[in-house]
Amino acid sequence: MVCRIGVVVLATALIYLCSVLLPPTAVATFDEVLDTTSDLVSGVGAKNWQYDMGIKKFVNSYTSYQFPNPFPPNQDPLSRLEFPIDQWFLGGEYDYIERNWSLEFQSWMNLNEESRTMMQDSDWDNENQPFQKTVFSESKCRLNSGWLFDLKLVLKPEWSIFRTLLPIGGLRYQSFSFTTHDGSQVGLDGHSIDLPGDGINFDQTFYHGYLGMEVNTKLNTSGVFRSVPSMDFKVSVDYGLATARNEDLHLLRSGRRITNENTSGHCWHAEATASFYARRNIKGLLSADFKRIITDGGHQLTNSVFNIDFSFDGARVWSDQLSITAATEFIF
């Protein structure tokens, strides 16, 4: 069901291209469909509300963590793990708009699980050569569940300076649950071994509150595209404090070996959106979004079977996230 919805949303986004590329008779039919949809939207919903529905694709994105050796020679890092994020997400945005402010809420969930990029695990465990990577492994990786939430307040003061430059603030929550599987490992001597089956269960959450600015402008395109009479452009930049929590269960290690990281730091975020008006209450949206999260803090290692439980500082958690989103917006 979810996959079918995703296909429908993608098809809706492609319609905008078709309106430009198709012959006049096909464009006329497309306009009739838009008119009917616009009439339906006008008869439902509540005043001051907008709803977007779309798909998001992550590109060249990952989330990583590393920790040092707490004992001499204190190599840093001792171990580093990098998990890819390149899945498709389905979601939407609910907006409530007043004259001087608006409240926006986004929610997204992953559509597919398997990543096309390999997870990487590296170790520097030779005490005589602390800067020499000694073990490297790659594994297939699936995202069992991924959730993204964003609650944003946009202020629209009537002062002249804020007519196009709007203050924003909000809260974000991200949750990722990965499982690595069917990997291979190679040592410094060139000897390699296969790692069949599941290898690591890794759960991660990010929380960040942020403040920033948003710039909006409008462009009249009625003389170019009949079905796209105008376009809105929006660019937002924000900065916030972030916290991260990790839990890593190594399934191939003896006992029940779990590492935890509790870290804090910051997040930079930038987004650019183009909105294509098809009718007064129907828009197509295309946006690009980038986040960089960097946090530092404590690392804990436990293994209940061997009665191991100790903690130390120096862990680092970071994530680069680039995504492209296509959506349809209905204005009530």
What are these regions (language model features)?
Residues 144-152, 162-166:
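A structural/positional concept
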Residues 210-243:
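Long, positively charged binding patches that form subdomain-scale interaction surfaces
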Residues 1-48:
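Cleavable N-terminal export/targeting peptides
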Residues 51-59, 105-111, 155, 167-175, ...:
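Transmembrane beta-barrel strands of outer-membrane/channel proteins
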Residues 29-117:
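N-terminal entry module detector
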Residues 90-96, 149-157, 169-173, 211-217, ...:
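Residues on the lipid-exposed face of transmembrane beta-strands in outer-membrane beta-barrel proteins
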Residues 35-48, 95-102, 155-165, 219-231, ...:
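Short loop/turn motifs that connect adjacent beta-strands in outer-membrane beta-barrel proteins
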Residues 60-87, 109-148, 174-208, 238-271, ...:
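Extracellular/periplasm-exposed beta-strand and loop segments of Gram-negative cell-envelope proteins
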